[in-house]
């Protein structure tokens, strides 16, 4: 064996050991979250009673609901009607929708609704200003009068009690933000939409629930989420220099010791992407932004005096969640080297463990989400498609990482809608 081959063998073996350690760590994380969610009391996993304020309506905070819209003419009518159904005292509820340079009739539709809806404020940003959703929300923040800011996306349909379910957490002065649960209403539109529906069940009912239950570190998720207005202004609003303003704000709140809560019963419904192309575009944006957040905040998180050692470890694992699919691609390359005889694994058993952990952790979380989300047999059969989709995620996360390395420019890109919200909800 040449020195070059020996060097390659050593490198491959070292990388394989590193991957095994990484996959074991994330497997344990998936398992802990799944056990936490599956063993939770019924009151935390199903629709529960709302605890009204004992002192009465007079103690309720004022609320500003914000939505950023760009080319959302297919859903904007339903959005306005859904906001009109929110169950909260009218004198304490403000609604602001920002048209972010739309070119498809969204602006005209919003102006029509504003003329007939006295409590709706419509703001217009000229096209070409940049900054994406963050900049649009910051525009709304300048006009907001509410104590609590609640953000929805344009395709979302919040349930009527969602505002009350959010604001009840702010009786605790330590709480700075609250994340609700989003469910998919169009799972039957395609295999991709069905997989996204399962992924959302796992993401909210298992991962987000587990982070809250085990570490008290849920994420502020960007839609169906609320934040204390004074805190948001104190940290400078949303960051217009990132395409995932939610992850960025989550980390800025954590770094100053603020508390984020997750309310599994604060539900709204949204439209999932229906094609692989749209899935790629959406998840690429998530990966690009999340990886940027890892670069921006990982050192600050690790040195944060507000966090315990376990909280720092969990925050680092959360930060690098969109790096793990890249490890899938590295593992695939290693498998190719082993299969072609260019390199050999140290131990065949270790190779088996590596590939098992690669899929078992995510499947544990997805399986728990399938059960807790009340999914049917069609959804269970669709689980088989998660394996190829996992490799797709690995490819897009790798591309996002490489594009950042070479400093390829990327602007915020909205998710295309297919139709108005009239599909069956998967909750």
List each model region and its residues.
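N-terminal signal-anchor transmembrane helix
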Residues: 32-92
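Membrane-embedded multi-pass helical conduit in multi-pass membrane proteins
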Residues: 37-40, 47-50, 55, 318-407
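Acidic helix N-cap motif at the loop->helix transition within catalytic regions
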Residues: 77, 104-112, 124, 161
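A conserved acidic beta->alpha catalytic loop
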Residues: 90, 99-108, 127-130, 157
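Long helical/loop segments within the catalytic core of UDP-sugar-dependent glycosyltransferases
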Residues: 114-126, 130-147, 160-243, 280, ...
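Acidic donor-binding loop at a coil-to-helix junction in glycosyltransferase catalytic cores
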Residues: 243-249
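Catalytic donor-sugar/metal-binding loop of nucleotide-sugar-dependent glycosyltransferases
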Residues: 250-268
């Amino acid at each position: 064996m040449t020195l070059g081959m020996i060097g390659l063998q050593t490198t491959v073996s070292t990388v394989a050991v590193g991957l095994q350690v990484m996959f074991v760590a994330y497997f344990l994380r998936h398992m802990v979250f799944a056990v936490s969610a599956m063993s939770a009391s019924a009151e935390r996993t199903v629709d529960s009673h709302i605890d009204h304020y004992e002192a009465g309506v007079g103690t309720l905070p004022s609320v500003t609901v914000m939505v950023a819209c760009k080319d959302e003419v297919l859903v904007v009518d339903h959005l306005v009607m859904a906001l009109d159904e929110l169950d909260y005292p009218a004198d304490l509820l403000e609604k602001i929708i920002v048209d972010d340079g739309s070119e498809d009739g969204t602006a005209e539709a919003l102006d029509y609704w504003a003329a007939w809806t006295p409590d709706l404020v419509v703001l217009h940003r000229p096209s070409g200003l940049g900054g994406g959703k963050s900049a649009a929300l910051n525009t709304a923040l300048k006009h907001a009068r509410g104590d609590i800011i609640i953000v929805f996306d344009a395709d979302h349909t919040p349930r009527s009690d969602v505002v009350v379910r959010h604001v009840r957490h702010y009786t605790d002065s330590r709480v700075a933000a609250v994340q609700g649960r989003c469910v998919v209403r169009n799972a039957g539109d395609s295999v991709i939409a069905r997989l996204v529906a399962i992924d959302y069940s796992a993401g909210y009912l298992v991962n987000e629930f587990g982070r809250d239950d085990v570490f008290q570190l849920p994420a502020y998720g960007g839609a169906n989420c609320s934040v204390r207005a004074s805190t948001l202004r104190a940290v400078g609003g949303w960051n217009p220099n990132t395409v995932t303003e939610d992850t960025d704000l989550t980390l800025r709140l954590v770094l100053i010791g603020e508390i984020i809560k997750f309310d599994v019963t604060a539900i709204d419904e949204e439209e999932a992407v229906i094609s692989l192309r749209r899935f790629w575009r959406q998840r690429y944006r998530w990966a690009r932004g999340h990886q940027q957040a890892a670069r921006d905040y990982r050192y600050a998180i690790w040195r944060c005096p507000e966090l315990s050692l376990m909280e720092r470890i969990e925050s680092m694992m959360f930060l690098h969640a969109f790096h793990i699919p890249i490890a899938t691609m590295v593992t695939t390359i290693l498998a190719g080297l082993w299969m072609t005889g260019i390199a050999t694994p140290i131990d065949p058993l270790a190779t088996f463990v590596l590939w098992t952990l690669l899929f078992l952790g995510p499947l544990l979380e997805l399986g728990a989400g399938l059960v807790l989300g009340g999914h049917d047999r069609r959804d269970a059969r669709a689980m088989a498609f998660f394996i190829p989709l996992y490799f797709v995620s690995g490819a897009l996360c790798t591309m996002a990482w490489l594009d950042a390395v070479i400093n390829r420019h990327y602007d915020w890109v909205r998710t295309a809608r297919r139709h108005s919200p009239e599909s069956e909800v998967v909750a």
